[in-house]
């Protein structure tokens, strides 16, 4: 400062201001220049909102740079103010020597310097408070402290600065990122829902169009309704007059066509299932199935001069006409009435009569056991043989077949014959030969019956030699549902209780004996195929309580068994 004072020109007439005037002058400058500086520095020194997270080192470096710039500007301003005041105070003191200890205005200059330093500190605190004033982005609440009786500004106030805005910025950025993620998720859900709605709307639109088309077809008035109305009006106008034959024919034809269309519509699902079958049985179940072979036989028979009469009177006249040969084959189609096998004579051609009777059985049979066959090789009387109930020999040709009454009950459901459920090809009519059938037993002669030895008696007849053939049960034909149920029950338990057997007989419509025999046969087949013996049987065999057929008997046991058989045979002959 002394060098500045020495280089100046000689001072003019100056007056030394008092302490109060110096304070007033400093306050005016602080209010004028300092306020402008604060106004100028405030927008520049405020921290700007950052895009990057607050914890990054770049944000911290920028904040430190801004703070250092603000502090440097404040220091420069303070130095300028101090230099101005020093110049004002040194002007009157320049008259005195620099080496003198006691000068004229030295006491006042120390007091002025103390006051100026206090004012500079106050101004610095004001600037700092303006710079660190909480902004709108800050999440900290500002608390207004009551004015204290002490000094307006103290060094402790400088230490209590507001917290940094970095935490608020971090929280704001984190929440904004979460909000953006939620928005993206909602948009993705909305897009997926829109796609699903579009697909379902398209499918529903197609179904609606199909339903509308079906309803339109159903609501369209058909020609049959119009014809029916016209016929009704015609009949109402002229009740005594007869309908024209041409109109009646048209009406009948339309009715038949409409009925056929409705039948096809109702059986749509069944037709679909039948198409899916690899081998269909529709042709087998038709009445004229296998008719080609009899036609060939009929042609060969016509060459030989033989023919079969198709009349219902039972006459055995030979017409020699091919139409007479084919009429029994077409009878089930046209009339729907079954052929009476008792009145038909199969004298010349056995294959033709067999095919016609079999076709009748297939089309009109109501009982699976009514399998009647006629064969000229086994039956000389020409009457059909009923395998269900064999007639006595005295009845002769007067016995009627079971198939004669089969077509009468049209309301009952059709039950197919047993050969339909058989899997062997030889049992089907397409094999060219008759299904397996028991040959009728020949009546036993009196001599063979009186002989007592039973040499002339057939194997199947009764042991008492009464001459009546044994009534054997035909082979049981189970339906598909019955077999499936029986197999399911067998898999559940191989042995049935009496209560369970009764329940099954009621549910399946079978006899208890049939169910019992089926289970026995199933167990025997399983045992034979597996080759292993029942552990219970093995245990009983080891204890000697179970005599299996495979165990050889001793000589004494064989003799005892023969004695028992002889005693039983003698007891059976005594009542006769």
UniProtKB/Swiss-Prot annotation:
- For region Disordered, the annotated ranges are 1-68, 80-102, 305-344, 364-410, 426-476
Entry keyword set: Developmental protein, DNA-binding, Homeobox, Nucleus, Transcription, Transcription regulation
The signal peptide, as residue positions, is: none
- Please report the name of this protein according to its UniProt entry: Homeobox protein invected
Query: Where along the chain is composition biased (Acidic residues)?
Result: 80-91
UniProt similarity note: Belongs to the engrailed homeobox family.
Q: Does the keyword Protein biosynthesis apply?
A: no
Query: Which PANTHER family would you find in this protein's record?
Result: HOMEOBOX PROTEIN ENGRAILED (PTHR24341), HOMEOBOX PROTEIN INVECTED (PTHR24341:SF6)
Taxonomic lineage of this organism? Eukaryota, Metazoa, Ecdysozoa, Arthropoda, Hexapoda
Cell compartments where the protein resides? Nucleus
Summarize tissue expression.
Answer: Expressed in row 6/7 of the embryonic neuroectoderm.
Which residues lie in Gly residues bias regions?
Answer: 450-468
The record places the DNA-binding region at 471-530
What is the protein's species of origin? Drosophila melanogaster (Fruit fly)
**GO cellular component term of the entry, any:** nucleus
């Amino acid at each position: 400062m002394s060098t500045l004072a020495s280089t100046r020109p000689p001072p003019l007439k100056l007056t030394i201001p008092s302490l109060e005037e110096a304070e007033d002058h400093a306050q005016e400058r602080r209010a004028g220049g300092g306020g402008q500086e604060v106004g100028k520095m405030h927008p520049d020194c405020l921290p700007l909102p950052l895009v990057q997270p607050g914890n990054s080192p770049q944000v911290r470096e920028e904040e430190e740079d801004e703070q250092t710039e603000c502090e440097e500007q404040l220091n420069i301003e303070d130095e300028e103010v101090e230099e101005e005041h020093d110049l004002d105070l040194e002007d009157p003191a320049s008259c005195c020597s620099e080496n003198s200890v006691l000068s004229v205005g030295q006491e006042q200059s120390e007091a002025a310097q103390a006051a100026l330093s206090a004012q500079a500190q106050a101004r610095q605190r004001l600037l700092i408070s303006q710079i660190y004033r909480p902004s709108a982005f800050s999440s900290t609440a500002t608390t207004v402290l009551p004015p204290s009786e002490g000094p307006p500004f103290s060094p402790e106030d400088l230490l209590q600065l507001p917290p940094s805005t970095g935490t608020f910025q971090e929280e704001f950025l984190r929440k904004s990122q979460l909000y953006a993620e939620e928005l993206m998720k909602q948009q993705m859900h909305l897009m997926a829902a829109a796609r699903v709605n579009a697909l379902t709307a398209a499918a529903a639109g197609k179904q609606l169009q199909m339903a509308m088309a079906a309803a339109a077809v159903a609501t369209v008035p058909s020609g049959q309704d119009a014809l029916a109305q016209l016929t009704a009006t015609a009949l109402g106008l002229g009740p005594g007059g007869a309908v024209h034959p041409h109109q009646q024919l048209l009406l009948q034809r339309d009715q038949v066509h409409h009925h056929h269309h409705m039948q096809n519509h109702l059986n749509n699902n069944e037709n679909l299932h039948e198409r899916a079958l690899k081998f269909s049985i529709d042709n087998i179940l038709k009445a004229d199935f296998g008719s080609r072979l009899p036609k060939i036989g009929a042609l060969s028979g016509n060459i030989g001069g033989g023919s079969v009469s198709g009349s219902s009177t039972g006459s055995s006249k030979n017409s020699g006409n091919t139409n007479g040969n084919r009429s029994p084959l077409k009878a089930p189609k046209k009339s729907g009435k079954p052929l009476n096998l008792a009145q038909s004579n199969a004298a010349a051609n056995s294959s033709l009569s067999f095919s016609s009777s079999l076709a009748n059985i297939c089309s009109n049979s109501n009982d699976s056991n009514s399998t009647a066959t006629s064969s000229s090789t086994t039956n000389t009387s020409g009457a059909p043989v009923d395998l269900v109930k064999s007639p006595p020999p005295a009845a002769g040709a007067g016995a009627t077949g079971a198939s004669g009454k089969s077509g009468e009950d049209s309301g009952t459901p059709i039950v197919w014959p047993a050969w339909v459920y058989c899997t062997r090809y030889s049992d089907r009519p397409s094999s060219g030969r008759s299904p397996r059938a028991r040959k009728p037993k020949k009546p036993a002669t009196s001599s063979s019956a009186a002989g007592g030895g039973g040499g002339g008696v057939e194997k199947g007849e009764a042991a008492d030699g009464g001459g009546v053939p044994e009534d054997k049960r035909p082979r049981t034909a189970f339906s598909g549902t019955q077999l499936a149920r029986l197999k399911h029950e067998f898999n559940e338990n191989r042995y049935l209780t009496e209560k369970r057997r009764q329940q099954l007989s009621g549910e399946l419509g079978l006899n208890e004996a049939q169910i019992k025999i089926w289970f026995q046969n199933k167990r025997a087949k399983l045992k034979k195929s597996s080759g292993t013996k029942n552990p219970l049987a093995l245990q009983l065999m080891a204890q000697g309580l179970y005599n299996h057929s495979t165990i050889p008997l001793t000589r004494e046991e064989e003799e005892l068994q023969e004695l028992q058989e002889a005693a039983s045979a003698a007891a059976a002959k005594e009542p006769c």
